[in-house]
């Protein structure tokens, strides 16, 4: 992560002189961005899975949601960093050098992340599946206490005889549910809105600077992610996703309405903030919670990787198609996202199992039972 961030910041330091716009420089720049993308992809899959495997079941959802909070907090920091760079540089310097400072800032958290990983233990479920029971018990004891650690280790061993099993051992449904959770999280359009938030705010107005309004939205995102953290273990995963989907649909349809009837000022800005806020209290953190929880132990690694791969594929599709859709018709773009939000609510209601209060071994038994009944 550190090398990819540093390389993205200034690849021409390694190969070229400043200002060189050669094809080779473009290749070098994109090479380092790809390395960074691989790092982000790995982290996005492994982090929630790791938290779910090591956390006590009664606070697992809250802790996995904290992962999303950290991401949103990082995005808010980026908003502030970019705003300060934009505000503190002359335009001619901003165009040539502003992006270098933005990419360079990645190196600091990336280096800290890499260093701190040396202090993190392996998950007890992985250790148990690889027959390292003493190490698994040691980790469980530190997290849960001695008596509970014995019970949890016994449950893990009871449902796990092998390190891995074939992907479809528990049927196709669990894989489809995981994939569709990822697809809907992206297809509802949130990342397109976040990527292009400054330009959207500048275009629709609202009486202020587009970048500053983006910072305000970042603060809202953090506050509503906290709502998810403090309600996920009380309300459950499914109710939050359904409420969030409906709230997002309302926000998206309101933006479409404002554009269709030329309603300017603060209302369209508030509608986008409502749309983002409901995402942050639902699909933002809770999708990751469910992806980390629903899969049986022995296929979790492969299944999470597939689900996250679909997430990044649809992230790319949505973010790359949004500018053209928005230019063609904002009404169409936000209307489409609103419809997808409604479909997402129906999908969660009909197909997604509730994982609140269940151990990961309970989910293994659930899918094992469903596979036998199918």
Residue spans for each PLM region:
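Short helix/loop segments within enzyme catalytic domains
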Residues: 143-145
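Short, well-structured alpha-helical segments
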Residues: 149-158
């Amino acid at each position: 992560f550190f090398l990819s961030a540093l390389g993205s910041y200034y690849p021409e330091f390694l190969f070229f002189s400043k200002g060189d716009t050669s094809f080779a420089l473009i290749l070098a720049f994109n090479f380092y961005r790809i390395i960074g993308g691989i790092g982000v992809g790995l982290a996005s899959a492994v982090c929630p899975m790791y938290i779910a495997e090591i956390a006590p079941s009664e606070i697992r959802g809250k802790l996995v949601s904290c992962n999303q909070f950290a991401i949103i907090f990082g995005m808010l920091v980026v908003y502030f960093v970019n705003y300060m760079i934009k505000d503190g540089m002359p335009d001619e310097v901003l165009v040539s050098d502003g992006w270098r400072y933005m990419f360079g800032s990645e190196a600091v958290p990336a280096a800290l992340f890499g260093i701190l990983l040396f202090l993190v233990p392996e998950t007890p479920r992985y250790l148990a599946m690889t027959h390292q029971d003493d190490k698994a018990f040691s980790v469980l004891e530190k997290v849960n206490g001695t008596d509970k650690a014995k019970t949890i280790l016994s449950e893990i061993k009871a449902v796990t005889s092998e390190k891995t099993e074939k992907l479809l051992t528990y049927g196709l449904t669990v894989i489809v549910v995981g994939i569709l959770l990822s697809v809907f999280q992206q297809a509802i359009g949130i990342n397109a809105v976040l990527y292009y938030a400054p330009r959207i705010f500048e275009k629709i107005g609202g009486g202020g600077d587009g970048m500053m309004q983006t910072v305000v939205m970042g603060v809202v995102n953090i506050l509503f992610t906290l709502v998810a953290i403090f309600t996920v273990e009380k309300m459950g995963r499914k109710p939050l996703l359904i409420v969030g989907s409906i709230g997002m649909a309302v926000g998206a349809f309101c933006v479409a309405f404002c554009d269709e009837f030329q309603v300017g000022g603060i209302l369209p800005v508030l509608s986008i903030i409502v749309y983002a806020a409901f995402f942050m209290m639902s699909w933002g953190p809770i999708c990751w919670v469910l992806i980390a929880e629903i899969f049986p132990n022995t296929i979790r690694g492969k299944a999470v990787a597939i689900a996250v791969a679909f997430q990044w594929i649809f992230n790319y599709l949505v973010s790359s198609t949004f500018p053209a859709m928005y230019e063609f018709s904002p009404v169409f773009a936000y209307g489409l996202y609103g419809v997808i939000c409604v479909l997402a609510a129906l999908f969660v209601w009909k197909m997604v199992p509730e994982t609140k209060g269940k151990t990961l071994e309970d989910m293994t038994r659930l899918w094992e039972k469903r596979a036998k009944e199918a």
